[in-house]
Design a protein with these regions (language model features):
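Aromatic-anchored, charged helix-turn/loop surface patch used as a conserved interaction hotspot
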Residues: 99-135
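General beta-strand structural signal in soluble alpha/beta enzymes
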Residues: 95-99, 138, 158-161
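Short, Lys/Arg-enriched N-terminal segments with co-localized hydrophobic residues
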Residues: 40-52
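N-terminal, charge-rich interaction modules
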Residues: 52-111, 197-198
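Gly/Ser/Thr-rich loops at beta-strand to alpha-helix junctions
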Residues: 74-77, 103-104, 113-115, 139-144, ...
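Helix-rich interaction surfaces within compact, conserved domain-sized segments
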Residues: 67, 124-130, 141-198
């Protein structure tokens, strides 16, 4: 093994508390660098301590058959660009869109072609209050009709889910704000398919 690694046969690995380590520690103590490093590390730990975090479950309110897309973006122009994408991809599309700002006035911005869906999307977005998240509710159409187009909107960073299932959103809340950490899309598995199920 030592020949393979090209390690001299008389090589001895340093052990914890060896004289070399002790000399280095003495040197650090003598010039104060050891204490400075510990102080800096302690200060960094205090600065990075964001305080407590709570995880909440927010249930999306919607009629059973209504489809939704829940995502994360990065710019206020999200509302305008997703709106344009929807009307250009599916002529006559009925949808409501809402987006949570994460800076400035931190308002819920909204748009759409169906007043009821806009109101419902706005209500759900405000319940989430997760910075830069958006929710798109659509009627008489499916996410598959628009999902790739929505993904290609420059402001869109990711999609959490696209579904008609009941959705629960796991939201982390700190003193600073809220963020989506995951979703529960529908129900847990009840078994494994058999030949009869195929």
């Amino acid at each position: 093994m030592s020949a393979f690694l090209n390690i001299p046969a008389n090589f001895t690995s340093p052990k914890a508390g060896s004289s070399g380590e002790k000399e280095a520690e003495k040197s650090e103590e003598a010039d104060g660098t050891g204490e400075q490093a510990r102080t800096a590390e302690s200060a960094m730990t205090e600065e990075n301590d964001g305080g407590d975090m709570d995880i909440k479950t927010v249930k999306i309110e919607k009629p059973e058959a209504l489809n939704l897309i829940l995502g994360h973006s990065h710019f206020i122009k999200t509302v305008e660009d997703i709106y344009e994408t929807m009307v250009n991809t599916v002529p006559g599309a009925k949808f409501g869109l809402a987006f949570c700002e994460s800076s400035g006035p931190c308002l819920v911005r909204y748009s759409g072609t169906d007043d009821d869906l806009v109101e419902l999307a706005t209500k759900n977005a405000y319940a989430l209050s997760a910075g830069h998240s958006f929710i798109l509710l659509m009627k008489d159409m499916f996410p598959i009709n628009v999902l790739n187009a929505v993904k290609n909107v420059p402001e869109v960073c990711r999609i959490f889910c696209a579904t008609a299932n009941p959705v629960e959103v796991l939201v982390a809340e700190t003193e600073q704000g809220r963020g989506i950490i995951g979703v529960i899309d529908g129900f847990k598995s009840k078994g494994i398919e058999s030949e009869a199920d195929i």
